[in-house]
A protein has these predicted regions:
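Short catalytic-loop micro-motif centered on adjacent basic/acidic residues
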Residues: 34-40, 192-194, 291-293
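Catalytic metal-binding/acid-base residues of hydrolase active sites
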Residues: 67, 196-197, 228, 295
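Histidine-acidic metal/acid-base catalytic patches
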Residues: 1-7, 11-29, 44, 55, ...
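Hydrophobic residues in well-ordered beta-strands that form the structural core
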Residues: 61-63, 193, 225, 292
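Active-site acidic/histidine proton-transfer and metal-coordination neighborhood
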Residues: 84-222
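N-terminal pre-domain/capping segments
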Residues: 1-111, 130-150, 168-170, 178, ...
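Residues at structural and domain junctions
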Residues: 36, 81, 159, 166, ...
């Protein structure tokens, strides 16, 4: 029985500069990682080397990220290429096809979890996300304190508009998930439903816990917490990071760990920004998967320091 969570490194940091999946995973193993997450930038050409490395035991795969591998002809990360919230049947069919393919691949590499995005609400005119973005660009800290009354009024108005439009998108997302539950269960894969960073992405953070807890106990799903995304949403005034984690703790599967800089850039090295990782670590459990999801811009030292800082909190 494990006494500490698994700590993995995501290929988000390095897949772009590799042509051979074996060499990529060998590099990650040489940094001291027993486990790796195969992220949403895995090109088809990397797959043979990945399978060889997994078969030889170079690393183990803790999780993968939809879509993995990428659809044929797509050569860069594209997790929102097809969305489960879209009602147009051709895109829906593509989402379903490539999600099932990702489930197959996750099972093939013996991953436990496939991390998934749940779509978004689209606006043809008067997108409320634009008003939020513009205000925060000029008043960077307006969302954190709750003291900016003009921003609070804008936020309330924008949320009302978002909720008014979101129903068909959210209903489609739930229907899409229902289409893959049995398939994922048959393959032994749990779907990690990830919190997102954009204003109009689904589900709304305030609804996440009720949605997941309201699913059938047999549904192969759980909550996947991204620290950077939660911090960005906290900066918008949409959640309190600790309270959000506490509400979703009963169905937590794992974490994407990365920091956010003073200018709002995420996927930074752990401890380099303002996220309270000591607070986050209070929610870690031995059965959880912890994944460092770092930007390709991070240096080798950034990766090593992030690993050491997480291990010190475990």
């Amino acid at each position: 029985m494990r006494t500490k969570p698994i700590l993995a490194l995501s290929t988000s940091w390095c897949s772009h500069r590799h042509r051979d999946g074996y060499v990529m995973l060998r590099e990650m193993a040489d940094l001291g990682y027993e486990y790796v997450e195969l992220s949403h930038g895995i090109r088809i050409t990397l797959v043979p080397g990945i399978l060889k490395a997994v078969e030889e035991g170079v690393v183990k795969i803790s999780s993968t990220h939809n879509f993995c591998p990428l659809p044929t002809g797509v050569v860069q990360a594209a997790p929102n290429l097809f969305e489960p919230s879209v009602t147009e049947h051709r895109e829906h069919d593509q989402w379903l096809r490539h999600t099932k393919r990702s489930i197959d691949f996750a099972a093939q590499v013996k991953a436990r979890v496939l991390v998934c995005h749940l779509g978004s609400v689209t606006f043809f005119w008067f997108d409320p996300a634009r008003n939020i973005r513009n205000y925060l660009r000029d008043h960077h800290d307006a969302g954190r304190g709750g003291d900016d009354q003009a921003y609070q009024a804008l936020l309330a108005k924008s949320l009302t508009r978002l909720r008014k439009r979101m129903r068909p998108f959210w209903e489609q997302t739930k229907a899409s998930l229902n289409e893959i539950y049995d398939y994922a269960s048959q393959k032994g894969i749990t779907l990690g439903l990830e919190n997102r960073e954009k204003f109009n992405e689904l589900p709304l953070d305030a609804d996440y816990a009720d949605f997941i807890m309201g699913q059938p106990p047999t549904a192969p799903i759980g909550y996947w917490h991204d620290t950077g995304h939660a911090d960005i949403k906290e900066g918008m005034g949409l959640l309190n990071h600790r309270q959000h984690l506490a509400k979703n703790a009963p169905r937590l599967l794992g974490f994407h760990l990365h920091d956010v800089s003073a200018t709002g850039s995420d996927h930074q090295g752990v401890g380099s920004g303002h996220i309270d990782f000591k607070m986050v670590s209070e929610f870690w459990r031995p059965e959880h998967l912890l994944t460092l999801e770092l930007s390709p811009r991070m240096t080798l030292d950034d990766v090593k320091i992030s690993k050491a800082r997480v291990e010190a909190l475990m």
